[in-house]
């Protein structure tokens, strides 16, 4: 049976189909040429020398093309212009060394022209083991046995054929005017065209027909030169690999800070110094006379003021101090920091903003106390009154001055004074270390309790903060396991056993905390591409540094150099594709940016830019458009565009307009509509989704293309990443440990990978090449193409189909691993929605963030239009960059995958700041919940929170007011934790009056997925609430008075304080005879000397005298009028007005009770400074307490408080036995409960009613080592 010869699938000779079929695309002739150094080989029967030449690859041309990119071009002053008008130096001196070497090579080749023909035998290299006629590779040119290896024979043949003359950059033309004609193979110069043809024939080539045309060689040279120094082909140095961790971390927050000083935020300050009369100086009771240090100030008046960390010894200043001046000075600035722009130049503050400013002050109070109490060691006290107690050793040279303050019972004196009496009543053994040894198992104990001066509020705040960090604490074994999981096992992390347990490593974080922080990041991106682009660029740089894949464009040029073309062709497919893939005017980082985009397909959609599509839709008859289609078809599967499949289909449909017609169901989106316009699911043609609607007769190519897309488009997959059990997961719409991929993922080869042609992207490329071959073979679509051009195009596609690029295998095996390794450590964790391939119903159409719960919206301002944020950023990529990377990837020759990744990944996981992103997520979550809690105090958000400060005036904050308040909260949080970049900025725009954060994404079929992260408990918000509850009872300590004030003349010699007035001077709305001046009241002045009358709130006309009640707002709006009309009545005492304040800052003016004092000047000045937007601090005139008898003078008071507001008074005449005249106050034993009450438990506190000033403080001896000191990584 006669075997049917197989039709050639390789290169055509340029004159139609070859009559002689070959199975190896000219490889037999190549071996023959290399073995036979005697010149042109013997042709087979029926094949001319010209036809045989056309089937041979140009080995010399290939080598010259690859070598020429490495040497500079030597141009003569004169030359022949090429097709583009560029002049090349093609003239060589007759007596040059190049000519001599070329002639020598030519003569060497001519010696063997008479050698006999090589034998012919059969081989089984054909398809289906078909024996085809081919030259034997085991015989030499004489017919004898040849035992040399093929590689040796090829090298010898090449050295004989190719000149040793250094190659030039670019191939000069073969013809020249002037001095001669130069051979582009060996650089020999001939003197006529006939001599040149004969010379070229000695190379086995012909002057007009070459296997690699000069046009291709020129484009190869330009292609290689353009790529030579491009950043995408540069391999990162080891030094640069050590900097990879810098791309992973933002600012490291100051989460753990230590304070070795006193744990107190309330300071006892002397207000009025002690006054000693001369006649009793000899009988002084002052302990200072005996050089005894007192635990309390020795003064006539001492008060408690807020001063955070006034006795601290910290390692880092959070710069959030709240320092309140003594009440004898003006503290109004503390209550006008927020929302008081119009009052900055006056000495007043807006009373409607008091609550917001108080909340901000309380937040600063909490933030400045987020310290851990440092364990500093103990030493036994040798003084007699402590019974050998172990007292804490303080660092610093001035430690001694603090002991009397820390331990009041160390003092002992027989003097009689309020201080001494207090010390004598204390429980002596409640001092120093309590109930725990200092050393445990030979090391300092992990924590210890100590009795010392401290305030209960600060102790509680620091205790809660320590408990929060303790919940985040993880042991080295957990870190070892978690890092190994995150590194996918490529880095061996070990945790050496150590007996010490005094480690504090707060790195554990919950999923909910990471999800809330993730939503904040997503809101920050919104629709702004400038925010996400740097993120993707950093990840692309990181991928380039850790990836073994190297982009080597010479793989493309070497492949194209083997394409057979005719120099007489007007079009060159190989040259055209090389020109398309040059890096000019393109961002060739797009390949790895596309990979980075896989991590964020929920917030950014990577699309192919419009410039990559065929111009004006293109035409199938255009070679340029065909290559645009090829480049586009290869690049589209790597994007995250869910409409990429239909864009690929419509790109070819655009080019087939006029040749093939498909049914389009939309009058606007027709077949001629640009493919890039099909960017939403509703534009998908029905014929694409149901390919049976495409006629295989009327549109065979488009039907084939649709079938290819449906069958061979890459399938999505997933890979495991992270350690959510320890580090949490920010995934919102996917399981915690899942990373989605748009292509199939296969396990990576842990040793040395080999070339694989079975992966999805290689199959996809092969199908695209086959489709294009069908296009060029059909004369219907290419009526103007010659058979030579068709053959050349088919050959080019075959080369591209089988190009030896490692990129497709890398994308399927190693790229997912790289993404999974870096994803857990990124500052912006992956945000993904499921990839849908060709399922239009599941295409995501909307991703949005909601700030407000629909069930709790009570104001029109809280509409969804202002609280929703729609997310979505399109990011255009260059298809040429992606295609170049797909076609030119290679691995290092000695690559061992697991060893490579161990070296590349280790610097990331050995960095000391590897956990900074986790800690930032925790702080972000704390800040969000704190903001929600605080905003709910000044606006009606229906958020369930205790409102302890409702008695402080406040307006109902609008969105703008709440945004200003939120901005201050954000600034305070960033300052306290030493952060410089984004924290709560996304919430500052729009309406920050939020109650919850939720995120939704909607599919095209209408299905919606909602994720509402559960708000975990916020320690900072809880501490602010605790401080607010304490403030509700101890407001005087913070410089605020509660209740109203009464303005009226009261003259008396009784030395009472207006902060605690006699009850008979106070009246309210329920007091008989009291009139109320309401908003609608009117004053009617009397005629002919009659007293003025006022229509009160009940509508009755009454004389303007007696007791009246005015709302503060009414007085502010009519301050000028009231000041002019009422001052005379007030000064005479005929009129007393109660102004309803609610809360107000105050200022004390002490006077000598032995001298006459009148407070009218203070009162009138205060009334004059009231404006519609502000009130100053209310002035009170207070007598100085005296420890001896005095002769009291009358005092005239004009402003008194309606409630007791003297809780900040600590003691009067503390160094004396008693107070004789004026306000009297002993040292408050209720604030020293555990020191004065032996029945009180040692750990008892009286918050929120009373702030204890002596407590048990827990101090810690934890270490906070860097990660490198806890675990060891073995690369």
Swiss-Prot record:
Catalyses which reaction(s): ATP + H2O = ADP + phosphate + H(+)
GO molecular function: ATP binding; ATP hydrolysis activity; RNA helicase activity; zinc ion binding
Segments forming C2H2-type zinc fingers: 181-203
Basic and acidic residues: bias regions: 18-35, 75-117
Organism the protein comes from: Reovirus type 1 (strain Lang)
Biological processes per GO annotation: 7-methylguanosine mRNA capping
Cofactor(s) in the UniProt record: Mg(2+); Mn(2+)
Region annotation Disordered: where it falls in the sequence: 1-149
Name assigned to this protein: Inner capsid protein lambda-1
Bias type Basic residues, positions: 1-12
Designated gene of the protein: L3
Major enzyme class: hydrolase
């Amino acid at each position: 049976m006669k075997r049917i010869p197989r039709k050639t699938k390789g290169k055509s000779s340029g004159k139609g189909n070859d009559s002689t079929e070959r199975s190896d695309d000219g490889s037999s002739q190549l071996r023959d040429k290399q073995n036979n150094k005697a010149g042109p080989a013997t042709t087979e029967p029926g094949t001319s020398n010209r036809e045989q030449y056309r089937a041979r690859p140009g080995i010399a041309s290939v080598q010259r093309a690859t070598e020429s990119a490495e040497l500079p071009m030597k141009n003569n002053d004169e030359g022949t212009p090429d097709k583009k008008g560029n002049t090349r130096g093609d003239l060589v001196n007759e007596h040059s060394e190049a000519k001599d070497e070329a002639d020598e090579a030519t003569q060497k080749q001519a010696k063997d022209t008479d050698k006999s023909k090589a034998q012919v035998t059969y081989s089984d290299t054909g398809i289906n083991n078909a024996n085809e006629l081919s030259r034997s590779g085991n015989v030499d040119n004489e017919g004898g046995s040849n035992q040399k290896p093929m590689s040796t024979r090829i090298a010898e043949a090449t050295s004989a054929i190719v000149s040793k003359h250094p190659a030039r950059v670019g191939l000069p033309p073969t013809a020249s005017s002037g001095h001669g004609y130069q051979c582009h193979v060996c650089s020999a110069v001939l003197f006529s065209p006939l001599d040149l043809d004969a010379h070229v024939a000695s190379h086995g080539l012909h002057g007009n027909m070459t296997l690699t045309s000069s046009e291709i060689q020129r484009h190869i040279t330009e292609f290689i030169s353009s790529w030579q120094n491009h950043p995408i082909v540069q391999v990162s140095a080891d030094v640069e690999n050590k900097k990879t961790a810098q791309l992973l971390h933002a600012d490291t927050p100051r989460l753990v800070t230590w304070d070795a000083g006193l744990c107190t935020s309330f300071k006892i300050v002397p207000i009025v110094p002690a006054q000693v009369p001369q006649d009793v100086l000899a009988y002084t009771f002052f302990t200072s006379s005996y050089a005894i240090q007192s635990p309390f100030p020795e003064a006539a008046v001492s008060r408690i003021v807020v001063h955070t960390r006034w006795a601290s010894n910290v390692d880092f200043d959070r710069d959030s101090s709240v320092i309140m001046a003594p009440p004898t000075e003006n503290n109004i600035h503390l209550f006008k920091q927020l929302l008081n722009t119009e009052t900055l130049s006056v000495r007043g503050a807006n009373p409607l903003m008091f609550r917001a400013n108080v909340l901000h002050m309380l937040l600063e109070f909490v933030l400045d106390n987020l310290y851990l109490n440092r364990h500093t060691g103990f030493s036994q006290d040798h003084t007699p009154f402590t019974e050998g107690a172990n007292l804490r050793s303080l660092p610093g040279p001035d430690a001694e001055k603090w002991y009397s303050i820390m331990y009041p019972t160390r003092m002992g004196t027989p003097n009689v004074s309020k201080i001494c009496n207090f010390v004598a009543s204390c429980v002596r053994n409640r001092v120093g270390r309590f109930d725990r040894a200092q050393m445990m198992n030979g090391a300092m104990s992990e924590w210890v309790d100590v009795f010392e001066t401290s305030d209960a509020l600060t102790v509680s705040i620091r205790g809660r903060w320590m408990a929060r960090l303790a919940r985040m604490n993880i042991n080295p074994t957990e870190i070892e396991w978690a890092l190994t999981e995150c590194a996918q096992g490529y880095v061996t992390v070990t945790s050496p056993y150590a007996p010490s347990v005094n480690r504090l490593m707060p790195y554990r974080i919950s999923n909910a905390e990471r999800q809330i922080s993730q939503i904040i990041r997503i809101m920050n991106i919104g629709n702004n591409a400038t925010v996400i682009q740097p993120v993707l660029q950093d990840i692309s740089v990181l991928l380039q540094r850790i990836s073994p894949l190297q982009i080597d464009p010479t793989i493309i040029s070497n492949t194209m150099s083997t394409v057979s073309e005719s120099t007489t062709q007007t079009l060159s497919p190989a040259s055209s594709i090389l020109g398309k893939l040059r890096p000019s005017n393109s961002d060739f980082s797009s390949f790895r940016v596309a990979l980075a985009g896989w991590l964020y397909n929920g917030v950014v959609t990577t699309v192919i830019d419009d410039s990559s599509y065929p111009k004006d839709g293109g035409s199938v008859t255009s070679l340029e458009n065909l290559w645009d289609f090829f480049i586009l078809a290869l690049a589209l599967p790597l994007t995250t565009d869910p409409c990429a499949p239909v864009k690929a289909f419509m790109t070819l449909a655009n080019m087939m307009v006029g040749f093939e017609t498909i049914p389009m169901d939309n009058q606007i989106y027709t077949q001629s509509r640009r493919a890039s316009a099909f960017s939403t699911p509703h534009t998908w043609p029905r014929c694409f989704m149901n390919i049976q609607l495409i006629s295989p007769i009327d549109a065979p190519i488009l039907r084939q293309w649709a079938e290819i897309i449906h069958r061979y488009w890459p399938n999505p997959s997933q890979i495991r990443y992270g350690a959510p059990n320890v580090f949490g997961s920010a995934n919102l719409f996917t399981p915690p440990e899942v990373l989605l991929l748009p292509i199939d993922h296969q396990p990576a080869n842990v040793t040395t990978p080999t070339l694989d042609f079975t992966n999805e992207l290689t199959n996809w490329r092969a199908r695209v090449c086959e489709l294009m071959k069908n296009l060029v073979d059909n004369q219907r679509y290419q009526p103007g193409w010659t058979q030579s051009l068709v053959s050349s195009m088919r050959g080019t596609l075959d080369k591209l189909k089988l190009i030896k690029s490692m990129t497709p295998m890398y994308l399927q095996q190693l790229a997912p691993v790289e993404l999974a390794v870096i994803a857990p450590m990124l500052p912006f964790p992956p945000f993904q929605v499921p990839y849908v391939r060709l399922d239009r119903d599941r295409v995501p159409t909307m991703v949005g963030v909601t700030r407000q719960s629909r069930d709790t919206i009570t104001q029109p301002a809280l509409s969804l239009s202002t609280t929703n944020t729609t997310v979505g950023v399109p990011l255009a990529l260059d298809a040429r960059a992606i295609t170049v990377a797909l076609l030119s990837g290679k691995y290092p020759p000695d690559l061992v995958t697991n060893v490579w990744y161990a070296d590349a990944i280790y610097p990331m996981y050995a960095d000391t700041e590897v956990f900074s992103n986790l800690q930032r997520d925790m702080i972000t979550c704390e800040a969000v919940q704190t903001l929600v809690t605080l905003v709910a105090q000044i606006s009606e958000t229906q958020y369930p929170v205790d409102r302890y400060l409702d008695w402080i005036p406040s307006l109902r904050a609008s969105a703008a007011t709440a945004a200003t308040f939120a901005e201050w909260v954000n600034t305070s949080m960033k300052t306290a934790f030493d952060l410089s970049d984004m924290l709560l900025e996304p919430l500052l725009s729009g309406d920050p009056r939020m109650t919850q954060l939720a995120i939704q994404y909607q599919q095209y079929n209408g299905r919606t997925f909602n994720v509402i992260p559960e708000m975990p408990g916020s320690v900072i918000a809880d501490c602010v609430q605790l401080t607010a509850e304490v403030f509700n009872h101890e407001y005087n300590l913070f410089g605020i008075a509660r209740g109203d004030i009464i303005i009226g003349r009261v003259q008396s010699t009784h030395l009472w304080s207006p902060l605690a007035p006699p009850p008979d001077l106070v009246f309210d709305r329920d007091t008989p005879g009291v009139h109320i001046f309401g908003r609608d009241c009117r004053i009617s002045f009397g005629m002919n000397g009659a007293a003025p009358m006022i229509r009160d709130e009940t509508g009755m006309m009454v004389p303007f005298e007696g007791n009246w009640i005015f709302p503060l707002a009414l007085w502010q709006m009519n301050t000028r009028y009231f000041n002019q009309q009422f001052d005379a009545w007030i000064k005479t005492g005929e009129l007393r007005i109660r102004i309803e304040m609610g809360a107000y800052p105050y200022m004390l003016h002490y006077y000598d009770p032995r001298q006459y004092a009148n407070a009218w000047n203070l009162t009138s000045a205060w009334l004059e400074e009231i404006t519609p937007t502000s009130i100053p601090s209310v002035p009170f005139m207070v007598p100085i307490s005296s420890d001896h008898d005095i002769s009291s003078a009358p005092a005239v008071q004009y402003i008194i408080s309606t409630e007791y507001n003297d809780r900040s008074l600590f003691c009067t005449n503390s160094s004396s036995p008693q107070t004789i005249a004026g306000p009297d106050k002993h040292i408050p034993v209720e604030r020293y409960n555990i020191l004065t009450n032996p029945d009180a438990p040692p750990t008892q506190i009286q918050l929120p009613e009373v702030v204890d000033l002596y407590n048990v403080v827990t101090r810690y001896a934890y270490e906070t080592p860097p990660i490198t000191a806890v675990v060891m990584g073995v690369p």
